[in-house]
């Protein structure tokens, strides 16, 4: 009888330790890679990229990046590779708007839109194609 109690206690303690060790892992905050390309699938340099919440008309809307919080929206510009990388605090769904001003090769403003669906432990990779026909509402 004593032997059964000892075996039961050892098994219970082992299972309890396994549950505690395995259940305490914090999720990795979501990350995103946004790629801006033209209609020829070439990267776009100096495109203005705005990330904002779906209901960004509210003055209380925030975008929670890993190291800072921005009111309503965050604006950055792409480098020559057309890529921007972000780290966020929370899972969320955000709108992405990209705009490239007119230049010698393209006499019209080009725009594109996309959506980031951010999940913990994942890096979301989104490619947004900009063109002359896209209109922001």
Describe the function of each predicted region.
Residues 1-22:
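Sec-dependent bacterial lipoprotein signal peptides
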Residues 80-95:
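Short Pro-Gly-centered beta-turn/loop motif in secreted/extracellular proteins
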Residues 32-38:
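A short, amphipathic beta-strand motif
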Residues 93-117:
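A short, solvent-exposed loop/turn motif at the edges and junctions
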Residues 25-27:
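Bacterial signal peptide processing site
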């Amino acid at each position: 009888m004593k032997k059964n109690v000892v075996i039961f206690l050892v098994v219970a303690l082992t299972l309890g330790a396994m549950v505690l060790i395995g259940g305490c892992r914090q999720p990795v905050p979501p990350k995103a890679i946004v790629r801006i390309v033209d209609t020829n699938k070439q990267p776009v340099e100096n495109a203005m990229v705005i990330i904002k919440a779906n209901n960004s008309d509210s003055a209380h809307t925030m975008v929670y990046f890993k190291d800072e919080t921005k009111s309503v929206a965050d604006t950055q510009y792409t480098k020559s590779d057309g890529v921007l990388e972000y780290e966020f605090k929370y899972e969320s769904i955000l709108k992405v708007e990209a705009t490239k001003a007119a230049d010698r090769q393209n006499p019209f403003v080009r725009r594109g839109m996309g959506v980031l669906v951010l999940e913990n432990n994942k890096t979301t990779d989104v490619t947004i194609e900009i063109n002359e026909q896209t209109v922001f509402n």
